[in-house]
Amino acid sequence: GGDIHEHKLKLIDYNAQNLGLKNVRTLLQNACTIGQKYGGRADRVLIDAPCSGLGVLRHKIDLRWRKQLSDLRTLPALQRRILESASQCVKPGGVLVYSTCTLNDDENSGIVNEFLQKHPEFHVENAAEKLAVPGHEGPFIQLLPQRDGMDGFFIARMKKES
């Protein structure tokens, strides 16, 4: 896993060790440039994109006071850059998963649909079928706190043509 924050990498390492996972490596890495370094080498890429966090407000109450309206305007540009760069890492036949913990369509389906229009080599797979999430229709998974009894998340699964 890669992140620009060292404290997050330490948390990933700690959790991987506690779970007995031996195949997890962490890198201090900017996701906006990762495609240049690892282009076309990955079977699977998971993007946990930085987002407004609107899906986790009930657990992270301080977000209500820390987030600014300007965040909602600037985050999609960062998310686009990350998705663009990370997509370059996926080799033909590989899978790219884009996820956030927000309910904002501009950060979710808006980003993915725009990406898919620019990248015909990727097609969306039905994430709800692949992940066996009952009660969810369509290609994307959008978990809603009021409906699903958990934090809000968005998941899109895309496959790169061989």
Can you say where each PLM-predicted feature lies in the sequence?
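S-adenosylmethionine
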Residues: 1-162
